[in-house]
Regions:
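Terminal catalytic/cofactor-binding subdomain
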Residues: 1-131, 138-142
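Sequence termini and other peripheral, non-core segments
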Residues: 1-54, 325, 329-473
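Loop-rich catalytic cores of soluble enzymes, especially ATP-dependent carboxylate-amine ligases
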Residues: 8-9, 105, 117-136, 140, ...
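Flexible loop/turn segments at secondary-structure boundaries
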Residues: 35-36, 106-107, 155, 292-296
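Long, well-ordered alpha-helical scaffolding segments within enzyme catalytic domains
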Residues: 78-92, 158-195, 298-322
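Short, glycine/acidic-rich hinge or "gate" loops at secondary-structure transitions
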Residues: 96-109, 159-164, 323-330
Length: 473
């Protein structure tokens, strides 16, 4: 199927930029001196079993900040900004959010790394299993999961313009399988541009651990990061093959359950992986973004915009090998880039040139003029590795240290959250009373929808209970 032609059809073009975005971001809590926090998850956030925005991941100290689904990257980041304000002002005053993917100095004894104290006992047992199987230290690495969905209106228009597939849900699944394969093939570019875990703190790797020759571009996205064992192999040739392989891995005891399968891209349908045959793929989750320490949110708007155009490119461009070989080549290239020195020119310049040139051609063909500036900015970095995130980090680390970099930015962002203590980042144009109300609602875990910003009209929901609030009363 020629998606390039489909995307240029007159009826499709008005919809090409329509998409839905969501983001999950992990941060370790640390002391203001850069040591792992020893306190429990703050009780001020209420119960983790239902909180829509602030959870814990593997450990008791690892916050997970979750945005609601948004219709633009700007709207998603706006809410992420607000959640950060709430999180930073709610943790103990001698703590901060550690701004790096690699954790701060960890305790010498693994027993002192506390697994998240959750109400659901099966969730605790699962974390204990992960600790035993992969080690606690690898679980302490943090990153960003970027959720992306092509708008249903775009999918429908693409479907209407073709005749090969006769069911829209099947067509949507076909689209996402192609995009997932292309992402796995070309994800080396994301690792190159946004990799940000060049070094680890002393003691992160044990003496007997296999470990990289630091610095590298991204420990987290290399074989030294968190991943399944080598005998776990899953095909992306089709959704059926993907699910069959994972099911077989569970049956053979190579995975404890389906959710243990960990990959740079995850196919999402319902709540469980087993829902996928019924729901089809609704969106995909990109799991290979390191935290950008040069942003108080761990990610900047240009990166979100670039990822949006990159997702369009992955639909636009053809696959050039059989599915499994295509993905395998991507694994090899990604490892090569992840293990490279942050200031070293990569060997994939020619392929990088092709990707960027084709992205610019695509933006021209689809009339997306505003995208060329963002794509051009990152194209400049292809031959200037010192300008990438890991490149800039290494420049600082050489003169100082990794922990100093984390301390400086972590403390700076923590202080910034208190500069306007009665205002809420992302919503500062609203009335002060509404901002204070929103802060409390986010902190306590009420789902929020802004129905009319001019009128200060909000919808709050907890479970089945709904309240409408105007002017914060």
């Amino acid at each position: 199927m020629n998606y390039r032609e489909l995307m240029q059809k007159k009826n499709v073009r008005p919809y090409v930029l329509m998409a839905r975005f969501g983001l999950e971001k992990e941060n370790q809590r640390s002391t203001r001196e850069g040591l792992l926090a020893t306190t429990d998850h703050p009780t001020v956030f209420g119960n983790r079993s239902y909180h829509p925005y602030i959870q814990t991941d593997f450990s008791e100290t690892q916050l997970e900040l979750i945005t609601p689904v948004a219709n633009s990257g700007t709207e998603m980041l706006r809410f992420l900004d607000a959640i950060h304000d709430v999180a930073r002002r709610s943790i103990p005053e001698d703590e901060m959010l550690w701004p790096l993917s690699m954790p701060p100095q960890l305790p010498t004894k693994d027993e002192e790394i506390k697994i998240a104290k959750l109400d659901q006992y099966d969730a605790v047992l699962y974390r204990r299993y992960l600790a035993k199987e992969y080690g606690k230290r690898k679980q302490m690495v943090s990153g960003i999961h970027f959720n992306f969905e092509y708008d249903q209106a775009l999918i429908q228009q693409l479907y209407d313009e073709q005749s090969e597939v006769t069911d829209c849900k099947q067509f949507k699944t076909k689209v996402y399988m192609k995009v997932a394969r292309n992402f796995l093939r070309y994800r080396w570019l994301i690792t190159y541009l946004f990799g940000a875990s060049p070094v680890s703190e002393d003691g992160y790797f044990r003496v007997y651990d296999d470990q990289p020759q630091e610095p590298i571009r991204s420990i987290r996205n290399s074989t030294y990061g968190y991943r399944n064992h080598d005998n776990v192999k899953v095909s992306y040739a089709s959704l059926e093959r993907y699910l069959e392989d994972i099911h077989r891995m569970v049956e053979n005891g190579l995975l404890s359950e389906e959710k243990e399968f960990y990959a740079p891209v995850r196919l999402r349908g319902g709540k469980q992986m087993s829902d996928l045959p019924k729901t089809g793929i609704r969106y995909i989750e990109l799991r290979n973004l390191d935290l950008n320490p040069f942003s108080r949110l761990g990610i900047v708007e240009d990166t979100v915009d670039f990822l949006h155009y990159f997702m369009l490119y992955l639909l636009w461009t053809d696959e050039k090998e059989e599915a499994d070989e295509w993905v395998k080549t991507g694994d090899i290239f990604n490892e090569q880039v992840a293990l490279g020195h942050p200031h070293e020119t990569i060997k994939l310049i020619a392929e990088g040139d092709r990707i960027f040139s084709e992205m610019i051609d695509m933006l021209d063909a689809l009339g997306i003029r505003k995208g060329k500036e963002v794509v051009g900015k990152y194209y400049q970095q292809l031959r200037n590795p010192q300008d990438t995130v890991s490149g800039k980090m290494w420049t600082i680390i050489q003169e100082n240290s990794n922990s100093e970099l984390g301390n400086i930015f972590g403390n700076q962002y923590q202080s910034m959250a208190f500069e306007r203590p009665y205002q809420l980042a992302g919503f500062r144009e609203m009335e002060l009373s509404t901002q204070i109300f929103l802060f409390d609602a986010i902190q306590k875990g009420l789902e929020i929808e802004i129905l009319d910003e001019q009128e200060q009209f909000l919808k709050l929901q907890h479970g089945e209970h709904i309240e409408y609030v105007k002017n914060a009363n």
